[in-house]
Amino acid sequence: VCLVEVVRVAVGRPLLELPAGTLDREESLADAALRELAEETGYRAGRLESVGGFWMSPGILRERMHLFVAGDLVAGPQALEPGEQIRTRHVAWDDAVTMCLDGTIEDAKSVAGILLTDARRRRPPSPSR
């Protein structure tokens, strides 16, 4: 798993997170995922799979996260915005799951994304309807 380490001013320290970002006007969800992955990590994905989505805090926000898993990655340079400081950190899948469970990864979207993906990978495929 390629995580990013980003200093979050509101928290006052760096957090480990999945690469993420905002959707540009007229941009598809998949295109946004590919763009953010490339900008933050430098990786270009040859394959992208939608895992699903979830509301972050529906009682107060309309923010919805859409989760994708990228594959067939090709390394390249990051394309950070001015002032952005993002370090990449590679960890094994099982280690990322453990980091969510032990509190090392504290970012809600990352915890939800990693654990949701892990749960779906471990379940047998459901029969077609």
Predicted regions and their residues:
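Conserved Nudix-box catalytic region and its N-terminal flanking loop in Nudix hydrolases
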Residues: 1-35, 39, 73, 77-78, ...
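Residues at the C-termini of beta-strands that transition into short coil/loop
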Residues: 5, 71, 92-94
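Nudix hydrolase/Nudix homology domain
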Residues: 10, 14, 25, 50, ...
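A contiguous pocket-lining binding segment that forms or flanks enzyme active sites
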Residues: 26-71, 78
